[in-house]
């Protein structure tokens, strides 16, 4: 079994040095590794995180932007909310 602990980057491929683990971002470039067996808790955490998203509509509902930018990593099932009019882009 993979050791799904520690810090990670959502840009790492595979995240957490194993395809059995997932990286949950807590900031745009950093996060923590988890074992995806607890998917309901992961889904809840994504729902509650103000910037994690799976769609533009989700960003609008959360009030954290109007564009869900997907991570360029096929191991990541979500993206980060941005305001498309933002200077940050």
From Swiss-Prot:
GO terms for molecular function: nutrient reservoir activity; toxin activity. Disulfide bonds join 4-21, 8-23, 16-33. This is Albumin-1. InterPro entries: Albumin_I, Albumin_I_a. Keywords: Disulfide bond, Knottin, Seed storage protein, Signal, Storage protein, Toxin. The keyword Acyltransferase does not apply. Residues 1 form the signal peptide. The keyword Signal applies. Residues 39-46 form a propeptide. A1b binds to basic 7S globulin (BG) and stimulates its phosphorylation activity. The C-terminal glycine may be removed from A1b. The presence of a 'disulfide through disulfide knot' structurally defines this protein as a knottin. The lineage of its organism: Eukaryota, Viridiplantae, Streptophyta, Embryophyta, Tracheophyta.
């Amino acid at each position: 079994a993979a050791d799904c602990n520690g810090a990670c980057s959502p840009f790492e491929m595979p995240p957490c040095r194993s395809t059995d683990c997932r990286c949950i971002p807590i900031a745009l470039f950093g996060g923590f590794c988890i074992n995806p067996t607890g998917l309901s808790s992961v889904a809840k955490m994504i729902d509650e995180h103000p910037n994690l998203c799976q769609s533009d509509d989700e960003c609008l509902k959360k009030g954290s932007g109007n564009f869900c930018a997907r991570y360029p990593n096929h191991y990541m099932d979500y993206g980060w909310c941005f305001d498309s009019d933002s200077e940050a882009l």
